[in-house]
Amino acid sequence: YDPVLPSALRQSSARKPLPASLPRQTRVIRPEEECCPVCGGELSSLGCDVSEQLELISSTFKVIETQRPKLACCRCDHIVQAPVPSKPIVRSYAGPGLLVHVITGKYADHLALYRQSEIYRRQGVDLSRATLGRWTGAVAELLEPLYDILRQYVLMPGKVHADNIPVPVQEPGSGKTRIARLWVYVRDDRNADSEMPTAVWFAYSPDRKGIYPQNYLAGYSG
């Protein structure tokens, strides 16, 4: 049974145009005939039919090899060499784009690290779950200054919305799960015609004890 929806709730069946911002690749398929197949006459242009097809180009790995030539002075033997480029994680071969992909997959797309490891293996690169976990921890440390600034902004004097979310957490070694908490603090003053950007700050606690929000809100007034 398929009830008839009111016209206001019906979704339009018209196909939306593909975003103009997407990169485009043009292929021209010309007729095989160089002259009219009926009479042999010369062919002239009569316009062109255009159609579009949306395609997905899968992410691919590449190795960026950095070479730093060493130059020696012929007079005093002084050696000149460019400095080593900085890396997101010291002594790691993970590039910034790869780290962004791992973190976005885990926290924005809810793609567990072991699943990401399987995906990368199908692409020909063996990245273990342990390796991805170490990278995730290292990126978390890199983002701590941004995390602190976000907390300061959200908990400025004024109105703050707060809530907590139950989160299942697996206990290491036991295979059992327990319920932890994510405390959510939101600054959103759009209803008061404020032009300040909205922001959300999350804090984790292993349980729901009140001592945690008390510590998070220490120094806050509003």
Protein language model annotation of sequence segments:
Residues 1-3, 11, 15-18, 30-33, ...:
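Gly/Pro-rich turn-and-neighbor structural signature
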Residues 1-93, 161-162:
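Short, flexible loop/hinge motifs at secondary-structure junctions
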Residues 15-19, 52-56, 82, 96-100, ...:
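General secondary-structure edge motif
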Residues 23-30, 103, 107, 123:
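Generic amphipathic alpha-helical segments used as scaffolds and interaction surfaces in large
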Residues 41-42, 48, 96, 174-176, ...:
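Intrinsically disordered, low-complexity regions
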Residues 45, 63, 78-82, 86, ...:
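Conserved helix-loop functional segments at active or binding sites
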Residues 61-113, 186-199:
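Active-site-adjacent "gating/activation" loops or surface patches in catalytic cores
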